[in-house]
A protein has these predicted regions:
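Short acidic, glycine-rich surface-loop motifs adjacent to enzyme active sites
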Residues: 229-259, 282, 398
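Short acidic/polar inter-strand loop motif in beta-rich domains
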Residues: 371-378, 397-412
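Noncatalytic modules at the cell exterior or secretory-pathway interfaces
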Residues: 383-399
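Single conserved hydrophobic/aromatic residue that forms the stacking wall/gate
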Residues: 496-497, 504-507
């Protein structure tokens, strides 16, 4: 095992995503660098070198965000069967590669095989397996090719030959509904049953990031830089095969810049602009989570109060407040017992910590101007040992034009207790990267009544773009699970119905 590989997996090393334009103005070096593409790399440093917000580059943008799994008749209502059966079209995924970035795939399931029992999977890159053959140019994980998978399928114990396995079932379900082969007995067919399949099984986020973001141990979470590496890998595979590529991402996050400088969203936009490339992402299930606050300060207002309810004591949570340039704000915090952290004056790069005596809650406030293009303001509020009750954040205008700002709490499965805004707003609740301009984002509706799936994330984007682009069935979707069984799931995994219709866009 190489020294760099050990650093990629080790919790004693922190990961930073570095763009080429940062290197043009800041001299950075590391003895472990993983190339993502010509424009972006991941640098690895000992944890003792940097606190997360102390990195000399664009600190918060460089810190990998964590992404979680989005919750889980449909084909007929979507119009998929009409496309498959229309003689002039017969759209079933022929000549298209569909790539999945998720929890892996149960390659033994017959829905991922041809009628002769051979696999439809071109490659599996399993980031969690460290003792196999690594993909070219990548310092971690193990790659399994078609020939190896076919050999495994012929073996008495396939997992001894290809040990990659989806132990969660999420990735198998997504891939099956998107492109599973027909199973007449179980009345099932995927949207693109003749497509070629490529899979990346993501490794879990490092412990230091889970602790920083207060993500419960039992919840799957994945790092932004690993997802970006997966996108780069799939793009390279499609180049090798000279095939159109549709990238399916059933992951989402409330973390990071919702504008033009988010790392994953920006990278997906770059890849999706390339010929024969298309990216599809779900919009998430955050509309009714009460995790978004839309602020508006009028010129005659001294401040606006934002109330956050913490229903039980919890290890912690964080709030990201974003304002578009040239807006600038400052904040103060009041505890449930009335103790006040006075207004922290705005200073870019400034940070203040305060421990509330009665609650024993530690609150840290970081001010940042983010991105090298826009300079949008981020105020990052982190509550450790969060006490039960109503916490109040007073937002003070420092320099305003519109008076608009937004706050987001983490996705609901990334919090260990019930925390929400008392005056929440369901708009702007599309999870990243579903807000990216070049990514096809899909919301969900209920087939039974034709109504919108109420939890489905809602637009617009902060730049005013219309999102989601499509809606598809999201309630009781039928698809393959583990152990060759079929299951139903609910949520904006509706993106999987969009994969075959978008292949025409990928081809063109």
């Amino acid at each position: 095992m190489s020294d760099c590989e050990e650093k990629i997996y080790s919790n004693d090393y922190v990961d930073f995503i570095i763009s080429k334009d940062v290197l043009d103005v800041i001299d950075l070096s590391s003895d472990c660098i993983q190339r993502i593409d010509e424009e972006k790399d991941t640098y690895f440093y000992p944890r003792s070198f940097f606190r997360i917000f102390d990195f000399p580059a664009d600190s918060y943008a460089s810190v990998p965000k964590c992404y979680g799994l989005l919750d889980e008749t449909a084909l007929e209502v979507s119009g998929i069967l009409k496309l498959q059966q229309q003689p002039a079209l017969a759209l079933k995924g022929q000549g298209v590669m569909i790539g999945f970035i998720d929890t892996g795939i149960d390659y033994r399931n017959p829905v991922f095989q041809y009628s002769d029992g051979t696999t439809r999977i071109y490659r599996i890159w399993d980031q969690t397996i460290r003792d196999g053959t690594k993909p070219e140019g990548i310092a971690y994980g193990s790659e399994y090719k078609t020939e190896q998978i076919n050999a495994a399928l012929r073996a008495e114990n396939p997992l001894e030959t290809v040990p990659s396995m989806d132990t969660n079932g999420h990735g198998t379900f997504v891939a099956g509904v998107a492109c599973g082969s027909e199973d007449v007995e179980d009345n099932f067919i995927g949207a693109a049953p003749f497509s070629e399949i490529a899979v990346v099984k993501l490794k879990e986020a490092k412990t230091y990031l889970r602790e920083f973001y207060f993500i419960p141990d039992s919840v799957p979470a994945y790092q932004e830089n690993d997802i970006m590496m997966a996108v780069s890998y799939l793009d390279r595979l499609a180049k090798e095969r000279d095939m159109p590529l549709v990238i399916c991402i059933a992951l989402g996050s409330n973390m990071g810049n919702r504008g033009k400088d988010g790392q994953l969203a920006t990278y997906l936009d770059i890849v999706s602009r390339r010929r024969k490339r298309c990216s599809v992402a779900a919009v998430g299930n955050e509309a009714n989570a009460r995790h978004h606050f839309l602020g508006k300060i009028q010129p005659d207002m001294e401040y606006e109060s934002v109330e956050v309810s913490v229903e039980e004591n919890m290890p912690g949570f964080f709030i990201e407040m974003w304002a578009n340039a040239p807006e600038l704000y400052a904040v103060s915090v009041s505890s449930p017992t009335g103790e006040v952290l006075p207004k922290v004056p705005y200073r870019s790069g400034g940070r203040q910590e305060f421990v509330f005596i009665f609650e024993q809650t530690r609150v840290s406030i970081d001010y940042r101007l983010t991105g090298r293009r826009q300079g949008n303001q981020l105020i990052y509020l982190r509550f450790s040992n969060a006490a039960q009750g109503i916490w109040t954040i007073n937002v003070y205008p420092q320099s305003i034009v519109t008076g608009d700002y937004n706050m987001w709490l983490p996705m609901r499965n990334f919090t260990s207790g019930n925390v929400f805004f008392l005056r929440s707003n369901p708009n702007h609740t599309i999870t990243v990267p579903g807000n990216a301009g070049q990514v096809i984002s899909t919301g969900g509706y209920n087939v039974a009544n034709g109504g919108l799936y109420l939890d489905s994330g809602r637009g617009f984007t902060l730049s005013g773009e219309v999102k989601p682009d499509f809606c598809a069935p999201a309630v009781n979707v039928y698809g393959p699970g583990l152990r060759n069984r079929f299951v139903t799931m609910t949520g904006t995994l509706s993106l999987i119905h969009i994969s075959e219709p978008t292949r025409q866009e990928a081809i063109s």
